[in-house]
Amino acid sequence: MSLHYQTGFGNACATEALPGALPAGRNSPQICPYGLYAEQLSGTAFTAPRAENRRSWLYRIRPGVQHLPFAPFAGAQRWLSDFGRQPVTPNQLRWSPLPMPDAPTDFIDGMHTWGGNGGPEEQSGVGIHLYAANRSMQGRFFYNADGEMLIVPQQGRLRLATELGLIDIEPYEIAVVPRGVRLRVELLDDVARGYVLENFGTAMRLPELGPIGSNCLANARDFQIPVAWYEDVEGDFELIAKFTGGFWRAPITHSPLNVVAWHGTHAPYKYDLRNFNTVGSISYDHPDPSIFTVLTSPSDTPGTANMDFAIFPPRILAMENTFRPPWFHRNIASEFMGLIHGVYDAKAEGFAPGGASLHNCMSGHGPDADTFEKASHADTSQAHYIRDTMAFMFETRRVIRPTAQALASPQRQDDYYQCWQGLQKHFDPEQA
């Protein structure tokens, strides 16, 4: 089944699965075409500036309110939103990939929270999760009232069956599901593994380009939004809600994926990271990693993001007389990294696809000893092609608080610090 999409980041879209299902000239007619119900889904305040306002009108077979009462849900045991107030270690942390589950596990029950900050009630901060699943969601649907979800597959393809249409993603692609959108996650392969950033703050947008100009980085035209699709199915289902960090379950006698037409700006979307237009130095020095930003969630402080999503894709390094890998760094922001494919150019060993690392505020990090030695003696008169890689970073203004399950995980590499212990002292006061 080949899916079709609309294009353009943040566009006001209009789509219908049946001809004439979208009302003409108004949002809420007295009687909707085909006997549908009109329902508005608001992702921002009514009075948010027009350029930032996100809402969609949905025309559905049954309204979203039609389900039985919610009760606490006992699943999703490893998906957390309470990051506690206990002291956080300043040590650099790294993990090997999650193993695939043995028991039948879907996207919801296969989520493992590795860290986060802030929270849904203050509508600021993030949750950072890894998932490993071996079956599709069956007989259940899910929505997240706490934040939008940025899904980064590392292994296995996913189909996101959402209220607003179908999205297929594979490794090298990402998808964003806005706050409140109901969906079912289906596996298109036997197993699936990847990363999820849960953004409690302002919805993600494209970063400003400044002197770069009107093009480059992630171009708006390359983002894809689903077309209307619906299923008219009745049965005994459950609707799972994530609300203020807790999980709730409501019985529902029909599929909530019953939107026949919709228009607006609050919609899921996908993006192929291979379309990222990378920029960099063509003279000397390695620019700041902000040039690799794909999406950003602004905070109330200008120039300081609630979170940034950046990637380190295949690229050409042409800087002369320059240490080309990412330099040693201590940062006021906190950095969580993952690897989708290949090798990260600052770490020769130990950082595997599906793995993760955390370098919190002011914790030193940088290339390992082997990478430093090789890059220090490389011939920089020749361009260097980095082909076999796709790494990414979730960067936040707040300290990322690792969860107890992340710290106790058998995937944690307790010897991570050793990768820097081989760095030699080269200082010689007699020779500049």
Swiss-Prot record:
Pathway recorded for this protein: Amino-acid degradation; L-phenylalanine degradation; acetoacetate and fumarate from L-phenylalanine: step 4/6
Source organism, top-level taxon: Bacteria
Recorded GO MF terms: homogentisate 1,2-dioxygenase activity; iron ion binding
Catalytic activity as recorded in UniProt: homogentisate + O2 = 4-maleylacetoacetate + H(+)
Gene Ontology CC: one annotated term: cytoplasm
Entry EC number(s): 1.13.11.5
UniProt keyword terms in alphabetical order: Dioxygenase, Iron, Metal-binding, Oxidoreductase, Phenylalanine catabolism, Tyrosine catabolism
Function summary: Involved in the catabolism of homogentisate (2,5-dihydroxyphenylacetate or 2,5-OH-PhAc), a central intermediate in the degradation of phenylalanine and tyrosine. Catalyzes the oxidative ring cleavage of the aromatic ring of homogentisate to yield maleylacetoacetate.
Family: Belongs to the homogentisate dioxygenase family.
The protein's name: Homogentisate 1,2-dioxygenase
Organism placement in taxonomy: Bacteria, Pseudomonadati, Pseudomonadota, Betaproteobacteria, Burkholderiales
The encoding gene: hmgA
